[in-house]
From Swiss-Prot:
Record-listed E.C. numbers: 2.4.2.17
Similarity comment text for this entry: Belongs to the ATP phosphoribosyltransferase family. Short subfamily.
Organism of provenance: Sinorhizobium fredii (strain NBRC 101917 / NGR234)
Protein name: ATP phosphoribosyltransferase
Biological function: Catalyzes the condensation of ATP and 5-phosphoribose 1-diphosphate to form N'-(5'-phosphoribosyl)-ATP (PR-ATP). Has a crucial role in the pathway because the rate of histidine biosynthesis seems to be controlled primarily by regulation of HisG enzymatic activity.
Lineage of the species this protein comes from: Bacteria, Pseudomonadati, Pseudomonadota, Alphaproteobacteria, Hyphomicrobiales
């Protein structure tokens, strides 16, 4: 059986992932030229590499089209329903750190927690006859956090197709759920993160598709243990 590992196709994520695999004794070599979207692992005949975008990796692992992938935990948890039943987070790789957070306008001086925001959501319905509007690309994580974890139901999600942090200033939403590494972009847009508003502390992960064919197959454990040994 050939095992397929999906890796980021460009940028810092590609470089960092490749470096970890090389330290693990799994040097990634492009098939063809450097712009090729296929690769192999030097000395591992039954392993092939597919270079994909971070969001494609999440989707392909979730569907079982590839066996392993390296991508952000945020994309995996947002993109795959029933995520823990369908994939294994085999290793946290220590790069690509960013937080998915709830951020509100700085001028909301009396709103510092999710409980405060729940009060605001109820007040919006009473005062304005509409639900609190949340701009985000993370609708699944937002629903789980607001409705599941905090019991807030009076809101609506506005799909963000551009720069999410600009939505409150433009009037297209009241607050946002977005990903941030330093918080500087949020501050530049006069937004603040709620004190208990971190939904997910994400980083790059080695993720495995849970497939019956993997059970008892030594190559699966060999790949995971090789990567874990250098972290």
């Amino acid at each position: 059986m050939t095992i397929t590992i999906a890796l980021p196709s460009k940028g810092r994520m590609k470089d960092d992932a490749s470096a970890i695999f090389e330290r693990a004794g799994m040097k990634i070599v492009a098939v063809g030229n450097d712009r090729s979207y296929r690769g192999r692992v030097e000395g591992w005949d039954d392993v092939e590499v597919a270079f994909l975008s971070a969001s494609e990796i999440s989707r392909e692992v979730g569907s079982g089209a590839v066996d392993f992938g390296v991508t952000g935990e945020d994309l995996v948890r947002e993109g795959i329903a029933d995520v823990d039943a369908r994939v294994e987070f085999a290793a946290r790789l220590g790069f690509g750190h960013a937080d998915v957070v709830v951020a509100v306008p700085e001028v909301w001086y009396d709103v510092d927690t999710m409980a405060d925001l729940g009060d605001v959501a109820a007040d919006f319905r009473a005062r304005h006859g509409r639900r609190l509007a949340i701009a985000t690309k993370y609708w699944r994580l937002t629903q789980q956090f607001f409705s599941g974890s905090h019991g807030i139901q009076l809101y609506r999600i506005v799909e963000s197709l551009g720069a999410t942090e600009g939505a409150p200033a433009s009037g297209s939403a009241d607050i946002i759920v977005d990903i941030t590494s330093t918080g500087s972009t949020l501050k530049a847009n006069h937004l603040k993160i709620l004190s208990d508003g971190v939904i997910l502390r994400s980083e790059a992960c080695l993720v495995r598709a849970r497939k019956p064919a993997h059970d008892g197959y030594p190559m699966i454990d060999r790949i995971i243990s090789s990567v874990r040994s250098v972290l």
